[in-house]
Swiss-Prot record:
Native species: Escherichia coli (strain K12)
The protein's name in its UniProt record: Uncharacterized protein YubB
Gene3D superfamilies in alphabetical order: Api92-like domains (3.30.70.1270)
Cited Pfam families: DUF1281, DUF1281_C
Keywords, sorted A to Z: Plasmid
């Protein structure tokens, strides 16, 4: 089941009518333009949603989004809505970046940002693995791309 970012930050009816590529309504952005500006992704939906861990006072959810991580505003709204601390870990192998953000009741309080570093395979059967930055290794389900 997808994680619909439209339930976190609402869209605009005129944008939805105008369509993904736009051109139906003059002066109204295409849904593609609106989504990338508002949500940070070309399609405001998280895929392969998986509750990977949970306890009495936490839940860990993994999901993928197209191209890159959702905008900070999306994560801040979730943290504010549920009055919680939220850690957002992300990685994108295609563009070779990763990051971590911590929110407290909707406020961004800490950030890490870096480039992924890879092992050098020794034969054709071996795939490269992410080796750094150390703070991202084993923190995401997979490295996207």
């Amino acid at each position: 089941m997808p994680f619909d970012l439209l339930t976190v930050l609402f869209t605009r009816l005129d944008v939805e009518v105008n369509g993904f590529n736009g051109g139906v309504l003059n002066g109204v952005p295409s849904a593609y333009h609106w989504y990338t500006e508002q949500y940070g992704v070309k399609g405001p939906c998280g895929y392969e949603v998986n509750i990977s861990s949970q306890g009495d006072n936490f839940i860990q959810v993994d999901f993928d989004t197209p191209w890159c991580q959702p905008e900070s505003d999306v994560i801040a709204v979730l943290s504010r809505r549920f009055s919680c601390t939220l850690e957002h870990w992300y990685a994108e192998q295609g563009c070779n970046f990763c990051g971590w953000q911590r929110y407290e009741r909707g406020e961004l309080v800490d950030v890490l940002w870096g480039e992924l570093e890879w092992s050098s395979p020794t034969d054709d059967d071996e795939l490269p693995e992410v080796t750094a930055p150390e703070w991202i290794v084993d923190k995401v389900a997979h490295y996207g791309g």
